[in-house]
Amino acid sequence: VNKVKRLLKQLKCPMYGHRFGPKKYKFYENIVALLIRYYCRLSYRRVVYFLDLLGIKCPSKSALQYTANKIKSEFWNRLLELTSGAKHEIIALDATGFSRTNPSYHYLRRIDGKIPKIYVKLNTGLSILNRKFCAAKIRIIPAHDIKDALALLRKVNTRKVVADKGYDANYLHEYCFSNNIEAHIPLREYGKSKHKNWSKRRLAAKHFDKTVYHQRELIESCFGSVKRKYGSSVNSKKASTIKSDIYGRLVCHNIFYYFIRVLGQSHANRNFYIINYNIFINSD
């Protein structure tokens, strides 16, 4: 609760959700309840019942749904920026999908049912050094990965970026060249170049480093971590609540990352992560 209060204070958020609305619950109480819901994989009714059992003041089910519907993507991206850090040495770009529902595919095959194909597309950037998500873009209707790459890079401060062949676009390399960012993206070969003046993507291919590029695999590992901990499907129906659901899972990953790393570590590493986690929690 104190960590959420500090984050909202740094974002200069108002005390209440709306200046003309009722002043019964403060804004941080809604955010805490939503983050607990995402972390524990509960429904709106169950998280209200769970917090009531613990004696924690919590808004009603409909109030939580209203808050999740009204929160904009800019707010969640600012939370990701605060919980991941200001500067990043290497950023990895990649995309993954979340299914709309969680059906039993075994049952669907047995009854010759139709396999659902529409999913939610998550395009995000991960800081390689601290394994935290620093920017994200969610599309309810899937689109190509490259369409969100430039918007993600504009939100972060980095020196190097690694991505797969799907992000090999000349305008992305031009942006990296103008902002002194090293782009390690494998070249998509369409055949021999017809022009003598090489494009920025072919100039970047001359400095391509496989050692740096293979660090991109860490973002796929973090995708698996998020889906195992918080679920690989979303139960929300509206576009705004679906986005809040996925953004909240990324914020939970950033906040509880140090604590999760303690499990399964040696005694020396465990003490190191405990000290850093306490510094992170108590930081203003």
Walk through the language-model features, giving the residues of each:
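Polybasic low-complexity intrinsically disordered regions
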Residues: H18-Y39, R45, Y49, S73-E182, ...
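A generic secondary-structure boundary signal that marks alpha-helix termini
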Residues: L42, I56, S73, K192, ...
